Amino acid sequence: MGSKSQQQVQVTPSASAAILVVMYIAAFVAAFNENIINVALHDIMAAFLVSAITAQWLVSGYMIVTSIFTAIMAFLSGRFSTRKLLFFACGCMVAGEVLCLIAPSFSVLLPSRILQAAGSGILFPLMMNVVLSCAPREKLGLYLSLGGACITLGP
């Protein structure tokens, strides 16, 4: 009945702490990526000679794709292991960031940003799943709150 991602894995307290720190950092970076583009929109419009409406798709597209991937995480977590999802999400984010960095045109920048969003959409709920798996039951509220704080403080 339980999938790979739902099974309780026994790890040492130090390994749990390391896993949680990695997940918190990943969630912080994902949240930071979500909003960092806002301060650069004017420069992007000038560099790529696009209108404000077109440039705004960097923000809107990111939010839409993040929402979609967050919504389908229940399906994905039932099909793939937490490790595979984490590597896929981080891979999407890193690949998207590198492609955004070297994007020669807006038509390359937008899909690169969408790739980042796919990673973020997976990372947010994945972090909560990992916290539920790794955190001690008596301190679950604290660890879930820390995860939420990382997402909130990212921007």
Residue spans of the language-model regions?
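Transmembrane-helix bundle of Major Facilitator Superfamily
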Residues: 2-155
